Amino acid sequence: MVSEAPPFWWDKPDWRALSLAPAAWLYGAVAGRRLLKAEPPKISLPVLCVGNFTVGGAGKTPTAIAFSAGAKARGLNPGIVSRGYGGAYKGLHVVDPAHDSARYVGDEPLLLARHASVALCPDRLKAARHLQALGCDFIIMDDGFQSARLFADFSLLVVDAARGIGNGKVIPAGPLRAPLTDQMRKTDALLRIGKGDGADFVIRQTARAGRPIYEARLKPSSTTPIAGNRWLAFAGIGNPEKFYASVAEAGGEIVETCSFPDHHSFASDDIRNLTDTARRQGLGLITTAKDQVRLATMIGVPAGFLTKLAVLNVDLKFDRNDALDHILDTVIERFKSRVTS
């Protein structure tokens, strides 16, 4: 899996995408066949897959958190299955948010573990069974749509409204993990997050395929006042522009930005440079919740840096009040039909 998306993937197709077309065709043929022909193993629990069509950030983490909260509100005990991108564990591991570090389990699982039990394992079936043994009765699969490692009763694909699916090409010519037509055949519904027309093409394709389309937005929040203050905003996530837009939406004035690779492991020089730049210009430092969990578990990060750091959290809010419950109802109904048939 490609961990860092080249910038040209998000622009109109150019000579680079064209030159990589043969490799993209081969990659797409293999990925598409695996997606369509595989028969994923099943578990005797309802499973919701939260995935996306492309490499890069789309909003899966806040979506998984929202469904975890929704399941808990029903009296369920949700568990989240993840591969743990950005971490060092290769076997089965249940994330302990009080003791694990992002270096070993990854930033997203550590953030998710604040909201539900999280099991990491390349074998998602094994992870789901372990969560079942721990008492979980509803599984949320964080990513894994293309892997076919665990059967999902419902697959919700997340797309960023501004970014969409980039140039619409398959890896390595573009960000798609498999041909869109193949992915659409396995998609149960689409969730468009935010504002913008970048996802218009995939929205049209989803509508033509007869799949339901849901709309949501990310509502920013922070324990630190954001509005009216001047910031140096930094992030090491898949789509930092979405974070910068959220800071502006919260009323913050962004004077400087600093973007790092996705899942970036911050070094002492990074922290020193950020601190010096902010001090020279009289700016506050603000980052994402994912970056904060990495920084908080790093060895050698000055305590003063963390206490002065503002963190912008985002909560997923559906445009329709009944949307989340409708999806949960569908997952559970499909599961009941599956186990009784």
UniProtKB/Swiss-Prot annotation:
Coiled coil: none annotated. The keyword Lipid metabolism applies. It comes from the Bacteria. Keywords: ATP-binding, Kinase, Lipid A biosynthesis, Lipid biosynthesis, Lipid metabolism, Nucleotide-binding, Transferase. The keyword Protein biosynthesis does not apply. Pfam families: LpxK. Pathway: Glycolipid biosynthesis; lipid IV(A) biosynthesis; lipid IV(A) from (3R)-3-hydroxytetradecanoyl-[acyl-carrier-protein] and UDP-N-acetyl-alpha-D-glucosamine: step 6/6. GO terms for cellular component: plasma membrane. Its EC number is 2.7.1.130. One of its GO terms (biological process) is lipopolysaccharide core region biosynthetic process. It catalyses: a lipid A disaccharide + ATP = a lipid IVA + ADP + H(+). InterPro entries: LpxK, P-loop_NTPase. ATP binds at T54, V55, G56, G57, A58, G59, K60, T61. GO terms for molecular function: ATP binding; tetraacyldisaccharide 4'-kinase activity. HAMAP family: LpxK. Belongs to the LpxK family. Transfers the gamma-phosphate of ATP to the 4'-position of a tetraacyldisaccharide 1-phosphate intermediate (termed DS-1-P) to form tetraacyldisaccharide 1,4'-bis-phosphate (lipid IVA). This is Tetraacyldisaccharide 4'-kinase. The gene is lpxK.
